[in-house]
Amino acid sequence: MHRRNFISGTIATAIAATGNLAKAHSSRELPDYNLPEEMLPRTVRIREDLAPFELHVFPDEFGLYWTMPGNVARRYVVGVGRPGLYVPGEFYIGAKKEWPSWTPTPGMLRREPNVYAKWAGGMAGGINNPLGARALYLFRPGRGDTFLRVHGTNNPKTLGRRVSNGCARLVNDQMIDLYNRVPMETRVVLHPPSV
């Protein structure tokens, strides 16, 4: 399915989302990211009658959609995997973690040992952890953990870009908002890029 079949328009009603959103959900102080209006979560109409309560990532538009009843979805602006590292397909949420620890994958260590070797033993959860405040772990039936995540970041400059090792990322306050909506076993679709 292509983006044009999913979204009926780009004009949408903004959802109240501020830098203070996460403070109600976390005892840790998060920065105010001061994102422009177009980077805030919005409720948008979707064209097709997709099942509610699914996650869909469209990499060409850097959009992550949490589908809801009534052919609407909550849209978040995300950063996605770099060319060659974005993996389209169907997944499910196999784990959810608050302030998760992080260890670089074997692939990350092979590709960029100078960047990741110092963290080969892992990093405790916290504001400077690459997975941010929350993470949704993507699993496949029969395979288990894919090492792909939908996770937080404290670097808003990475949103709307192809920057990651395959994961989708949101700023921490928006990730907390999404995390609180998405239950275990939720179906996740990473749609293929158009090129």
Language-model segments: residues:
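Generic beta-structure capping elements
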Residues: 96, 151-153, 193
